[in-house]
Amino acid sequence: MAQNDTLIKGWQPVIGLEVHVQLMTNTKLFSPAKNQFGEDANTLVDLIDLGLPGVLPVLNEGAMKQGIKFGLATNAKIAETMIFDRKNYFYPDLPKGYQITQLHYPIVRDGVVEVNGKKIRIHQAHLEEDAGKSIHDKYDDKLSLIHISEPTRP
């Protein structure tokens, strides 16, 4: 397709991708629990991961630094203030009933990655914790289990 061609007169296709990356930090994004892959289900869990009353999340400084490094590497604008949002939804694999994310105020905006001479725009990059993981059909076809070690991974 030539640069000025369009599929339908007056329209040009634009494709966007949402890419999820798990950061290699020692601990989870808002929890002191270890952030290790491949461990048995529900062995790396802290009270913060479960959302028990009275527990308060603390941001993982290493994850924040990795986000800033990504912004610098992509020549992006780095947020001067870190603001997180509480995205409420109810899934069995989200024990708190909400996910902490940077929905409205991401750590990085307007970056660029060059690939084969073409500039690919990075609209934003934000930090957010993972939800849990539902496990279906592993032990019984009538039973679903929840892997709680996943929540709050950066």
Language-model region placement:
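Short "domain-exit" segments at the C-terminal end of structured domains
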Residues: E150-P154
